[in-house]
Amino acid sequence: MNAATGMSGYPAARLSSFYFFYYAVLGAFTPYWSLYLESRGLGVTAISVLMSLWYATRIVSPSLWTTLAARSPQPIRWLHLGCALAVGSFALFLLPLNYVGLFVVMTAFCFAYNAVMPQFESITMSHLAARSDRYGLIRVWGSIGFIVVVASFGWLIDARRLGIGALPWLMLPVLAAVLGSALINRYAHDPDASRTAADEGFRARLRQPHVIAFFVAAFLTQVSFGPFYTFFSIYLSEHGYSTATQGVLWTVGVLAEIAVFFLSSRIFRRWDAARVLMFALLSASVRWLMTALFPDNTPLMVLAQLTHALNFGAFFAAAMQLLVRFFPGRLNGHGQGVFYGLPSGVGGVCGALLAGQL
């Protein structure tokens, strides 16, 4: 990770490793997990319900976990606990579970895995401090991890004929690496466990109109991405795309996202984060129209995926900038919890469930 370790003053390699392995897991989960559930004989509605648990648990676990961590004398232990629970619960997918069993295990895994990232974002920001414009240079390793797994797992499942049933076995070692990375990371300084004044300041900021508008925009964005993350691979399969080709299309989007993260510090020196956010929202509407109208036109599907640079990469980088602005210092952990919880959680589950009924 030479690009990451080249930045002095904070543990770039350690921070980057967590993003790499965390999003590598999502590189398998996001495009292929619905196909895995389908291979176990589940129908569209059942898959929709199970996949919606990823978003449903986001409603509760991020804010709960960040609050518990913030009030703990050793908050880093909550990161370790969450990662350990994610590994342990995911291992249960190796068992021959019925639908109820899948529901319970999926709930436990999604709860734990969603819980840890907002806390780690706060850890990252504690190291970056005034250099938050360099966040993209750390976060980009998550996109690289995602793309490595999307491409390699698609090849292993399709070309090497391991079959989609091998997916949990392939994912488990990557999850173990997430736990390993969590164990070598820590806060830049020990957070203050006395939170009364901070909690009051957070609630006051949360009521500000521009902060409310930001969270509404984030909510609507996640509603639109819910169907994409849940059913895009199945949608591609129905239109004749092989598993390997699906992996390529997912990879194209993340490659575009990587470019934006690498350029993010330059972008935010030129344009305000709020303006970047609005442009990202506009690009999302164009993307979904192209995906709906031209599923059999491969070049246009590639072009639609390239807009991921804007409607995810630019959106997310701008959101992190705004969260630092809206919730500075020790308020950032709470802000990250709300961002991952309410807009992403409620918006995502609404999008996934609505898509399952269409």
Please annotate each region the language model reported.
Residues 2-10, 185-220:
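Juxtamembrane intracellular "pre-TM" segments in multi-pass secondary transporters
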Residues 77-91, 275-290:
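Structural signature of the two symmetry-related core transmembrane helices
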Residues 20, 89-90, 99-117, 219, ...:
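Hydrophobic core of transmembrane alpha-helices in multi-pass small-molecule transporters
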Residues 166-183:
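Symmetry-related core transmembrane helices of the 12-TM Major Facilitator Superfamily/SLC fold
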Residues 107-141:
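Cytoplasmic helix-loop-helix junction between adjacent transmembrane helices
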Residues 60-74, 157-158, 259-273:
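Helix-to-loop junctions at the C-terminal end of transmembrane segments
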Residues 5-58, 210-249:
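Helix-loop boundary and gating motifs at the non-cytosolic
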Residues 44-45, 129-141, 243-244, 327-340:
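Loop-to-transmembrane helix entry/capping segments in MFS-fold secondary transporters
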